[in-house]
Amino acid sequence: MNYPVCVLTMHHCNNNENDFAIRPELFKKALLMALDEGYKFINYAQFKDIVAGRSKASKKSILLTFDDGYFDNYKFAYPILKELNIPAVCFLITDKIRDFKRQDYDFSFKKHKEIDYDKDAEYFLNLDEIRQMQESGLFEFDSHTASHFSCRSDDEAKLREEFSSSLAKIKELFPEKTEFGFCFPKGHFNEFSQRIVKEYYGFAFSVIDGGFCMGDDKFKIRRIDISNNAKSESDYIFRIKKKLFVYSTPFIGKIYSDFRNRSFK
């Protein structure tokens, strides 16, 4: 059986009340729910084997991904993942990586839409935090462009600059890596950018809702958003549980995803 992988995507794990953030306590409850329901969190190497056709996914497989590389991933999510021994992938905006010593661990986190990508360096992971997470064996990192540039653009020179610069930084930071993936910022892409990205990376993630099966288009890998826009904790857990059930079920998940995303080509 060609089982789907449920690739989960999120941005923030902090105590802000907004659609892009999951409170740490709720994040842990969601992970424990998935484990209690028999789901298995796979690491990035295992997922890359599935993408490349070197192995098949087991039933109820999950890959956890974080977009942008925010400091709250380190402060709040990372300790929970260490406690539960759950691996994850983080897609870095590579121009935001700084080698600085963090002075204050208690600053008030801004809401996602209030973050200034040019000025708010402290909201992103620094080099030491990235290294700690990578050396734990739980986290791997890949590219999310250099500057969070929209890949709906038709500016070939700028797209190539974003792809190549980000790839070069990832290679510099992780010289042992031999396979490189990409995540489209905000999930935005078009046929033009998708064609160009193939020259630099082996696969790419979208935000098209759904699971990923071996043999699917590996340059628009579907993911399942687990950001918190629910009315209550119980509603949130129910929604995640339902999404996992639907998208981990062969055939049913594919039909449902295709119907929901019929505007995508």
Indicate residue ranges for each PLM-predicted region.
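Short, glycine/acidic-enriched loop or turn micro-motifs at the edges of active sites
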Residues: 70-71, 147
